[in-house]
Curated annotation (Swiss-Prot):
Keyword RNA-binding on entry: yes
Database matches in SUPFAM superfamilies: Ribosomal protein S8
Function as written in the Swiss-Prot or TrEMBL entry: One of the primary rRNA binding proteins, it binds directly to 16S rRNA central domain where it helps coordinate assembly of the platform of the 30S subunit.
Protein name, as recorded: Small ribosomal subunit protein uS8
Quaternary structure (record): Part of the 30S ribosomal subunit. Contacts proteins S5 and S12.
Native source species: Nitrobacter winogradskyi (strain ATCC 25391 / DSM 10237 / CIP 104748 / NCIMB 11846 / Nb-255)
Length: 132
């Protein structure tokens, strides 16, 4: 099944799996999703992910979710820029999530990265979603 917004699909799968306290969740594989998951892993919001190849030739990403004292590490995950309403921010206007306790994930000319990495690299871009 094709989705029109793969980032929203990924966010929804993670949110739903954490509400049910699932240890893992899978999603169709793509480079963009893998890059987003790499940012979430480096920031400590997920344990990890692995690419799984099926005999039919399609790949899936198996995401290992992270919990602390039985509660999901991700308290809120919210889509900001959508296909119908793109949200861009310059390096000066990058949003701070909960006074710096959360992160914004951006798509920049230098790749997908967290907001603090974008500030360090002095680049702006499309604000994909926020995590707290």
């Amino acid at each position: 099944m094709s989705t029109h917004d793969p980032i929203s699909d990924l966010i929804t799968r993670i949110r739903n799996a954490q509400m049910r306290s699932k240890p893992k969740v899978s999603t169709p594989g793509s480079k963009m999703r893998a890059n987003v998951l790499e940012v979430l892993k480096s920031e400590g919001y997920i344990r990890g992910y692995a690419s799984v190849e099926h005999s039919s030739g399609r790949s899936e990403l198996e995401i290992e979710l992270k919990y602390f004292d039985g509660e999901p590490v991700i308290r809120e995950i919210e889509r900001v820029s959508r296909p119908g309403r793109r949200v861009y921010a310059s390096v000066k206007n990058l949003p701070r999530v909960n006074n710096g306790l959360g992160i914004s994930v951006l798509s920049t000319p230098k790749g997908i990265m967290a907001d603090h990495e974008a500030r360090d690299a002095n680049v702006g871009g499309e604000v994909l979603f926020t995590v707290f």
